[in-house]
A protein has these predicted regions:
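Catalytic cores of the polymerase beta-like nucleotidyltransferase superfamily
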Residues: 1-376
Length: 376
């Protein structure tokens, strides 16, 4: 039993599954990202389990017995509580699009794992005896921080894997193997739907090392295809430095960084002309309207932004110096709310657009008065 296998086998979540499957097979494996994350020391709460030695009809009957929910059209994966339970399979491309695959049952561990995208996602751990299967060198690549594809032909069958490589590089801070990067440069993502592209972009936007993923988007020529941008190498490298710093220092909201920071900066520095065609969640539209400065904003400009929100909620508050200044101005946690009497403005006879203009004039005056006082 391997060390990591022993640890996984002790997981209490797996006991019921072992007891349930024991009369039928002892060849059930934790697969994919579960093994990868466990080996990276991450806590595993959801399990992908591939079950061998049971024919499809019997497997369907067993899944019906526990009330598992089947998903998929070509080949069922069953969801039950925090488990994805499936039979091993091979996949062969038969046409255009991500659904044009011929799927077949494959009761062979090596053959079934060949369909995986990267070596680090092709490792397997038996839930009964903890044995560790690694046919393609995933453990070695994991230790070296390398994303390496398994098979040229299989990898090229789904161009989404190019974007998966980008988001994995950003989440794990891994480099893409030279041969894999060369293959990816030959693959077009034009067959992908906007929905599938955005699914991977959202993972990139939430990653810790977004600058790594950004540079791979540049190297793969995807900045133009996705965002309509044509950047020089110098521009890309300088932006990556800015992005790395911004993501590091951006205050967390509800325990996590705002996933819109990537696009906020990209649009601010270069102008993403196809922004509204990207099909991203509605919440992203607000980030193009957020104040952006390519230079150091003044205290007056910070107070003006704080009229609308506490600066901890501003996407541009992404450096230690800005955070310190916001706190000194007293607008990090709270808005700047000068005492402006709207009723008095109306009483003075202001109407229509003049009302807003007068409010803004008084706000500007309040900002000047605030700046004339010592910092709090």
């Amino acid at each position: 039993m391997s060390k990591i296998g022993s640890k996984i086998c002790k997981n209490k979540n797996l006991k019921w599954l072992r007891d349930f499957l024991a009369p039928y097979t002892k060849r059930a494996y934790i697969v994919g990202g579960c093994v990868r994350d466990a080996m990276l020391g991450k806590k595993i709460s959801d399990f992908d389990v591939e079950i061998y030695g049971i024919d499809p009809a019997k497997f369907d009957a067993l899944m019906a017995q526990i009330g598992a929910c089947g998903v998929g059209k070509n080949y069922f994966v069953y969801k039950f509580k925090n488990f994805d339970l499936s039979l091993p399979r091979t996949e062969n491309k038969t046409g255009e699009g991500h659904k044009a695959f011929e799927v077949a049952y494959a009761d062979d561990e090596r053959a079934a794992s060949l369909r995986r995208d990267f070596t680090i996602n092709a490792m397997m751990i038996n839930i009964f005896d903890g044995s560790f299967l690694d046919f393609y060198g995933g453990e070695r690549d994991l230790k070296r921080g390398i994303l390496r594809h398994i098979d040229d032909e299989k990898f090229a069958e789904d161009s989404l894997r190019v974007l998966r490589a980008v988001q994995f590089s950003a989440r794990l801070n891994f480099r893409i193997a030279r041969d894999s990067l060369r293959l990816m440069k030959c693959l077009s993502i034009s067959d992908l739907s906007r929905e599938r592209i955005n699914g991977e972009l959202m993972k990139l936007f939430g990653a810790k090392f977004q600058e790594v993923g950004f540079l791979y988007l540049y190297k793969l020529g995807l900045l133009g295809k996705i965002f309509g941008l044509n950047l020089s190498r110098e521009e890309a490298e300088k932006f990556a430095v800015k992005l790395k710093s911004a993501v590091k220092f951006l205050p967390k909201q509800n325990g996590k960084k705002d996933e819109r920071e990537f696009l906020y900066l990209l649009n601010g520095y270069f102008g993403v002309r196809n922004f509204y065609d990207l099909g991203l969640p509605k919440s992203f539209e607000a980030c193009v309207k957020e104040p952006f400065f390519s230079r150091r904003p003044s205290d007056g400009e910070l107070l003006k932004i704080a009229l609308d929100k506490p600066l901890k909620n501003w996407l541009g508050l992404n450096s230690p110096s800005l955070i310190k200044r916001a706190k000194n101005l007293g607008v990090y946690e709270a808005k700047f709310e000068p005492a402006i009497d709207t009723a008095e403005i109306l009483k003075q006879g202001f109407k229509g657009a003049a009302i807003g203009a007068e409010i803004r004039r008084r706000q500007d005056l309040a900002i000047k008065e605030r700046l004339a006082k010592p910092s709090v």
